[in-house]
Amino acid sequence: MACRVAGNNNNPEQLWQSLLQKKDASGEIPEMRWEPYLRRDSRNAKILKETTSRGYFLDRLEDFDGQFFGISPKEAEQMDPQQRLSLEVTWEALENAGITARSLSGSDTAVFWGVNSDDYSKLVLEDLPNVEAWMGIGTAYCGVPNRISYHLNLMGPSTAVDAACASSLVAVHHGVQAIILGESKVAIVGGVNALCGPGLTRVLDKAGAVSSEGRCCSFDNDVKGYGRGEGAAAIVLKNLSAAIKDGDHIMAVIKGTAVAQDGKTNGIMAPNAKAQQLVAHNALKVGNIDPLTVGYVEAHATSTPLGDPTEVSAIAAVYGADREPEAPCFIGSIKPNIGHLEAGAGAMGFIKAVMAVQKGVLAPQANLTTLTKKIDWDNVGLKVVQQETKWPATDDVRRAAICSYGYGGTVSHAVIEQFNFPETLDLKPGASATNPTVLLLSGPQEKRLPIQARALRNWLQADGSQQDLQRVAATLAVRRDHHDYRAAIVVESKEDAIQALGHLADGANDAWTSQSRVFGSGINRDVVWVFSGHGAQWADMGKELLQNPIFYQAVQPLDEIVEAEIGLSPIALLRSGEFEASDHVQILTYIMQIGISAVLHSHGVYPQAIIGHSVGEIAASVVAGALTAEEGAVLITRRSVLYRQVMGQGGMILVNKPYAEVAQELAGREDLVVAIDSSPSSCVVAGSTEAVAEKAAEFKERSIKTFTVRTDIAFHSPMLNQLVDPLMQSLEGSLAPTTPTRAKLYSTSLRDPRGSDLRDATYWANNMVNPVHLTSAVQAALDDSYRVFLEVSSHPLVSHSINETIMDAGIEDYCMIPTLARKKPSEKSILHAVGQLHTRGANVDWKSQLSGPWAGGLPNTSWMHKPTWRQIGAGPVSTSQTHDVEKHTLLGQRIGVAGTDTVVYTTRLDNESKPFPGSHPLHGTEIVPAAGLVNTFVKATGATVLNNVVLRVPVAINAPRSVQIVAQREDVKIMSRLIQENEGNNDDSSWVTHTTARWESSSSSPVPAQIDVEATKARIGTRLRDEFSIDYLDKVGVSAMGFPWAVTEHYGNTKEMIARVDAAPSVAADAELPWDASSWAPILDAATSVGSTIFFNEPRLRMPAQIERVDIFTRANPPKVGWLYVQEASDTALASHVSVCDEAGNVVAKFTSMRFSEIEGTPGVSGSMESLVHQMAWPPAVPAEEPLPINKLLLISQDVPLREAYAATISSSTQVTLLANANDLIINRAESLLTKETAIVYIPSQVSSLQDVPKSAETFTWQLLELIKFVVNNALPVKIFVVTSNTGEGETPTALAHAPLVGLSRVIASEHPDQFGGLIDTEVLTFPLTTMRYIQGADIIRIRDGVARTMRLRSLPRHRLIQQQDQQQQQPQLLPRPDGTYLITGGLGALGLEVADFLVTQGARRVILISRRGLPPRRLWSKMEPSSPLAPTITKILDLEARGATIHVLPLDISQLTAADALTTALDTLSLPPVRGVVHAAGVLDNELVLDTTPDAFARVLAPKITGGLVLNEVFPPQSVDFFILFSSCGQLVGFTGQSSYGAGNSFLDALASHRQARGDRGARAFQWTAWRALGMGASTDFINAELASKGITDVTADEAFAAWRHAARYEGIDHAVVLRALPLDADEPLPSPALADIIVRRSASASADSSPSSSPEKQTIPTSGPELKAYLDKAIRGCVAAVLHLPAADEVDSKAALADLGVDSVMTVTLRQKLQQALRVKVPPTLTWSHPTVGHLVGWFAEKVGKE
């Protein structure tokens, strides 16, 4: 159990002491709780003063240890504190129960949690401007149990229970039921309550339920209501038999639970005594319990005048009846101590009852002065516990009942009883109170270890001083979770433990303490045991271990064998400590290693791989299962006897020089040889005594270090050849070797360390005379990914050599651990080694050595709390202080200037307060429309005339501004300055004047004559399309409107126009407008906009610059619908007069001589469309100064003639290997070829027909994927290239089949830039070796005209612009005609329906929607439920038909080859006018990383793109339709992460468009779209938007997308249009994609500086190499991670922790990449944080990249 409630009661034991002392934890609510409500509404202050502010509160509800659970501060602040509390108390409950979270992971464990407070939800979700995605699950009731299940990986039922105040006892009932019914083996139940807001308290005040004192006085005569309380309780339930079997500490047994409802009472909140009795009887019945045997009832007792007496009477009826006066049933309630926890109340009462039955003590009632007189206490058989009372001895078994009721009528009841579980100390053989043991501590972060150590030390000195140390060790090892940062402390006594823990707490390690972080998930933690050879002996070795029964039992049978063979007892030798003879040492080395191995096994440590060194190979073979221990004893004994023949004749020295060099130096000599290859820099030389001494002296003279090996035998030298035959004879029939069965066995006797030779007599003869290849064996283990080595020896002999070998391999994450060392306690040394293995993450079965009883009461995890609370916005600012956006002005707080006629209006302007409902961008920056400024002047002055309105500088909304409108006697002006400039700057120079005017309060001019609308229309004669104005403005770069007006009738020429305008087209004529009806801005915005279109013969992006005069002729509200009459002004070339009329033609307002200015930088007619629509250009590539060192080529192709044709053009100086397919490489590995100088080149085969394209494309893409997977997964140092020929033009079947490789290659290059060299498309069959070497960092390279070229996005070519003499009469080619039929694949998808809407809007009258799923028959449409997923689709189709179109839905899978015939037949059946346009928008998106792709998933994505495109191409051949639009994506152009299959399919569509254009199809066009906002498969989400931003681009709205379509329609002879916008970059920020190089805009250095961790005001110089570079990178990267996670400082980030464990989710990953890229100026691949999951890994990667650059 666990709990956390008011009064600093943070666990059940603290709570119990508080109960015994009758403490009342009530107090005032912390000030911060209600503070947001004081800011939210000025009326709240008075109300809050009247609201009960006292209760039972946690001192620091906001505190949470999110880092422990891997929850970032950003996510944590969006979580209800109830979720945070519940997570922590659940962890504490599991620790209290001795059940590890890891043991429950993946299990059917259930979680039921009482919760019914939504205070935090209201607090954060009502702060609408700051609502975020995580707040949904973060504030939901279900989020409490679901969060527990998620973080513990529990897969059983997980349910929130809301039964008001009965919730948590109902949760207990559900947990019991889940176990009884077999749904779950373990249930975690509980409840929580957090009081974050005043709302419900206010409700309860009104209902009279809450005491004004905010405290509970259960059973008291003066009860006035209850005090609300907060906190959480968690209880772990398990089947009794399972708990006994598992050795759990059973605190109590639940005998019965029941839940019911009290039916229709006097009121829904009124209690019902009968229902309370009934539920109690039901619980007793379940447990077959006599109520007279229940000694105590924990009552609900909320302290209400009605509730308490009702409940007591019900309890009396059940438990008090038939009681003897001297044996009453005791009752009490916990609420006066900790308050009424509402949803958590039942669980807290349950915990109190468990403590009572467990301890046999009844806690006294707090806050009880006089018992209520509404109960006849003398005759009810009940007694309130008023003093601490021992449980009556008359009870055989202590039983208690718990009541809990909800104000909605839920009644619940539980009956529990004590359980006595006899524990016995059953230590394993050989263990005793004085034997050493190991204490294990851990934490998710390193800084937790000292805190945990301090807590355990303090406990051992106090509450745990009487606990058995072995039990404490068992608890920590077996009953607690082991996190990534670990400490293992070997101790012999409690005093020893206290001292060692103190050292760790103070940051100093004890000699027997090991501390480390476990190796990351990408590092193999399996252990290689290394059995070293001769030379580890020391006096007294083994003496201590002989006292260990495990050691003794392992060596005693071997002792008998040796003694029978040679009359010598190894055990006796070990006890004597006298064994210098070489033959004795060999035998004892073997004996020790076998004994140590047995002790290690007893501690739960086993090898996964084994290396034997020299004589150590014998024990290694035994432990691996290749020999028996007895065979090993015979072998070592007989060989040692033979050694006596050569004793005293030889010697050995260790030489500090590589094996190969010394071997070359000694070549040809028999008296002196290299015997052991120890490490890359050392070896051992053996030979005759004289030769060794002579060579040692020579080495000394040459300053080469040598060390003498303690032996008089020249092991592993020709001197032992004479012993080979005798050895073979002596072993004949004595060995029966087998293949190793227990672990992988590496050989040091064979040239191939992985050799599988049987360990027979021949092997051991070779082992005796051949050199020892230790370096090779260790290197093989490293190559097989082993990183943990344990030397099994009496003293570390080869550890240094192995360390050298590992460091020479450049491996950083490894460990080399010895077992014993000279003159150190053996038992402690072995435990120390086991502890070191544990701290590195190696598997240790602690149950094998610490399986006995365990200790309860150990300190729980020490939380590292940090305040985590959402900062709530200030709420709505008074309209007296800021402008009202619905009035469309900038008039905020009005301030009169004393003594003058000046009035100043001040306000703040930002994106949240823009005074217009739409969007009004100018070159990407949102500005206030001119109409809004004029409206502001009119409303500020009350003027009817404005003269000389000068619009000087647009009012931009790209950053928050302080705005002032200054109105004087005749003048008015608008000024602003950026708010950040305002800080600390009182200088007027920062104010910008935007607009000025002179004003008159009344007009002397007469109202103009009424406009004769019909006569004007007749005079003009030319009817324009209703969309003329919008289309014209869109064409010149006005992509959106600030107001939603629409033209419904339009006549015009270059001299005059008249247009009927509806200012609010979506609002019915008699309905209320969605803005202030007095606002002139909407209709005036139409006037300024339509007024500019009179210059359509000279299309330019223009904006109003000056208006000579503005007249308002009416005091009435402006018309919703009216006429705009536009005339070309005669006084200037670019000015117009605009009259605003009502529907009758009466002039209500007029702009006289509105002059327009052309916007600087507008590039020709395309305007800002040029920043949206692009072409793919292929300028020459820039070669690198240093070529790639490619000297070997592996050409892989199944097309033999093609492969050989390319090979024939390669210089003979380059080694070329030809392979048929990737499997040849994967199977044969060709390791000698796979070096840094090697390039693997994939050459796809030629394809002869279009029918073969789909299957060939699948084959080619999958073969390339197999190659990249092989190279990446095996960490090969090679680069992969693809070579194609003339793919770019898409003219041939081969080009179409190869095209998917283009998109695939771009994504591969993005995800694996270090392994992928690029795709090179040649124009002739000449191998592009020079291009491969010199064109670096490019994903796709085309060689045309002999020049290597790379793709860049550029504006559409102006010479392709269709020159139109009459834009109203000539229909653009890519838009529909009323007489045609138009077909859309993917037609029922969101994107397809938007396309249909667009085509209908553009004039299409017949549309066919093709979709795999189709729709139900039309006769069923009217019966469709609104909730049906098809309802929106049907509604959309009916809407299109209501607009005059006919829509046909054709169910057809376009991805099937048979679809062509089916489509043709269907079109014939429909018998519609000819199809004039096709839009292929069908597709499937299956995002997977390159390494995770499967053939099936890839084929599923390719089919609708490739087969679907070819089907349409067959049915509608080139030139048979006006337009053939293919919906592609820009994802493959910029290498969108996870879109390898989607990118491949889309690049095929790009090629198909080129293929058709090459056949004269002018209407074939592929659109490479960016993400459509909220639409389609590429719909922009938080993740997509972050990924787009990381690529330097944005999404588009549907309106922008179709504007791009219309823009592209004006160009001919182009086969594609790339639709995206580039984001501006900092001055020195790396280019996200080379494709953007020509369209990107960079900020100036001063403008791009910010204060984020990724760019400080002072640009630091990045070190170029060494420790300084790594230190810099570590700090910078941790700073970026901290910024993403909203951590206060970089120091909060653990460099060794996985980013995912820190709380970095998929969206944050993209943001992190951006920050890293900006901070370190290095392009970051999308998969970097997946392949380099910690800051430490990232430091290594960036160090290499930064060093290169």
From Swiss-Prot:
Active site: C165, H300, H340, H920, D1085
Top class in the EC scheme: transferase
Region (N-terminal hotdog fold): 888-1006
Signal sequence, renumbered to the chain: none
GO annotation (BP), single: secondary metabolite biosynthetic process
Catalytic activity: 3 malonyl-CoA + acetyl-CoA + NADPH + 3 H(+) = 6-methylsalicylate + 3 CO2 + NADP(+) + 4 CoA + H2O
Chain intervals for the UniProt region annotation (Malonyl-CoA:ACP transacylase (MAT) domain): 528-843
Domain of life: Eukaryota
Claim: Transferase is one of the keywords in the record: yes
Function: 6-methylsalicylic acid synthase; part of the gene cluster that mediates the biosynthesis of aculins. The pathway begins with the synthesis of 6-methylsalicylic acid by the polyketide synthase (PKS) acuA via condensation of acetate and malonate units. The 6-methylsalicylic acid decarboxylase acuB then catalyzes the decarboxylation of 6-methylsalicylic acid to yield m-cresol (also known as 3-methylphenol). These first reactions occur in the cytosol.
Protein name: 6-methylsalicylic acid synthase acuA
